[in-house]
């Protein structure tokens, strides 16, 4: 399958499933789409990218943790450090068990990244030789369920939040260093009844193929 064939098929599948889609300008990609999955106001935003020079489709999604939940985590860290370390360890294990690529962004304390959990992303590649509608749709579903697992764990342990996205220190640092951090919009988080997440609206695909750059 060629890159043009892959782009055509992905667009057809998105249209067939009536998913909301936004075109993104990305000089490093043959195609860069943002789609909402599943349908409806509770859907999450996913980046669907075909990087230049690669024979794959990268699917990814970024989740930003609510400011109120971050404050609860900070309190948890101070009151019971061992319990906090166990909790974040369990989050990592849960992500590993989902069999998706993932990355987490922890709050900075000096040179250390001790917490709270500020954002996380999930991603999967789909190579052209295995690209079918079934694989594409199940990839979206798998990433969505991986996100939901962590979102519900955060909500159960640290409350529903205050409806305001919290800071992401890694993005602030990247901006200071002249790098382009992911940007986000309140448009999608405002449509969530629980308000614990905010969606990345940039999602540029990096040349290094670090999964954290897929979202």
Model-derived regions, located:
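Short, internal acidic amphipathic alpha-helical interface segments
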Residues: 64-119
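Ampiphathic alpha-helical segments that act as solvent-exposed interaction surfaces
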Residues: 78-97, 128-161
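Glycine-rich, often proline-containing surface loops adjacent to acidic residues and nearby aromatics
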Residues: 55-60, 114-129
């Amino acid at each position: 399958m060629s890159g043009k064939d892959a782009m055509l098929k992905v667009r057809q599948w998105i249209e067939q499933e009536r998913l909301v889609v936004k075109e993104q300008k990305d000089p490093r990609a043959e195609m860069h789409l943002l789609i909402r999955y599943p349908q409806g106001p509770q859907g999450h935003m996913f980046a669907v990218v075909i990087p230049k020079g690669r024979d794959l489709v990268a699917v990814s999604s970024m989740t930003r943790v609510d400011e109120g939940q971050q404050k609860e985590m900070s309190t948890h860290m101070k009151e019971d450090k061992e319990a906090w370390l166990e909790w974040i360890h369990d989050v990592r294990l849960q992500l590993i068990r989902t069999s998706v690529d993932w990355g987490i962004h922890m709050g900075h304390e000096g040179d250390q990244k001790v917490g709270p959990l500020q954002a996380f992303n999930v991603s999967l590649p789909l190579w052209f030789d295995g690209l079918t509608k079934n694989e594409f749709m199940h990839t979206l579903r798998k990433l969505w369920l991986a996100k939901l697992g962590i979102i519900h764990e955060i909500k159960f342990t640290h409350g529903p939040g205050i409806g305001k996205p919290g800071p992401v220190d890694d993005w602030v640092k990247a901006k200071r260093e002249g790098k382009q951090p992911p940007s986000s919009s309140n448009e999608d988080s405002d449509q969530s009844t629980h308000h614990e997440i905010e969606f990345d609206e940039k999602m540029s695909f990096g040349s290094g193929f670090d999964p954290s750059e897929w979202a």
